[in-house]
Amino acid sequence: MLSEHHHQLLKATIPLLEAGGEALTRHFYGIMLSEYPEVRPLFNQAHQASGAQPRALANGILQYARHIDRLDALGPLVGQIVNKHVSLQVLPEQYPIVGSCLLRAIREVLGAEVATDAVIAAWAAAYQQLADLLIGAEEGVYADSAAAPGGWRGARPFQVARKVIESDEIVSLYLQPADGGAVMTFRPGQYIGLKLTVDGQEVRRNYSLSAPPNGSTYRISVKREPGGVVSNFLHDAVGTGATIDLFPPSGDFVLQPGNRPLVLISGGVGITPTLPMLHAAHEQSRPVTFLHFARSGRVHAFRDWVDDLVARHAQARRFYCYEEDGAAPADAYGRSSAELLDRWMPTPRDLDVYFVGPPAFMGAIKRMLGELGVPAGQMHWEFFGPAAALEG
């Protein structure tokens, strides 16, 4: 239980976290990943190397300290953490490892004069409070997934039923349960967790579900990333008939019910979670505008599928913008701009807008949407990787 004295000590560390939180989390990951190899599969080494994961954790710790008096304000952050943990199957027994490494990092980075026994005790109590909150929420999701029709808990073997080349960079895998059973439904926008063995090492990754739910199979669509351990493995080494362990669908970037016109904006492989959303809009006869930005027609996946669906939906429109002028025609050439959004989005701007793509792309889209009058509460976005503050 956190005491008032604990609260005061935690708040006193906020300036230190603001100034050096990323150094602390880098040290934390260095300790944990070197001394506890059993947790390495939960972490993407590319995100470690880029600093994205340490930055995300530093931001999470800082937000927790800032809101220690009113944890209800952390709702969106807690939801993101729970969904990521569930998709990778983080378990209660792994929390003490994280806690001990975090307290050690606080002591070693801040120094014994600042990180006194009292400060460490305050952070130990705060961490336990957060761990209990997350463990309880995650157990609820695990139990719900196991109880759902076609649901399961933990890893479930799936086989690659089909492998389809979608563009020069993207390949789709159609996955069906090895046991021949049904699969649980999911909400448009959610992702699935994969458990793989690559070069003798276990790795886990999330991929958006890119086809509407059908009760029997899932589809993921993977962009080949230069140097990407898992994406290149899925492109080059996984074929029809291969077995992949999957964790149940999760994620809080989902299409919300409503009657407002819908706008879906994607950049590159960010198109994947918007496809089930577009299909849902078609099923609901909901007005929808689909905007996709790509480098060229060669890397634009699912164009024919989108064109066909839009042609069958009386209240749907679609627009494409390519950076390069090539063989495939587009509605515009260049990069995303406020002028294009203004031209293509419906008016009035009382819209629900969902956008996904590289962080810089999403930051620009968010800024432009605000300039064009879209209410902040009606903008929704998803990070592929560690969640971060979206500048824009």
Residue ranges of predicted features:
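Histidine-anchored nucleotide/phosphate-binding helix
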Residues: 271-282
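A short, basic/flexible loop-to-alpha-helix module at the beginning of a structural domain
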Residues: 247-260
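Reductase modules of NAD(P)H-dependent flavoproteins
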Residues: 17, 288-392
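Short, glycine-rich nucleotide/cofactor-binding loops
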Residues: 261-272
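Ferredoxin-reductase
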Residues: 148-243, 294-296, 307, 321-325
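Globin-like tetrapyrrole-binding proteins
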Residues: 1-154
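Short, conserved phosphate/pyrophosphate- and ester-handling motifs at nucleotide-, phospho-/glycolipid
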Residues: 189, 270, 358
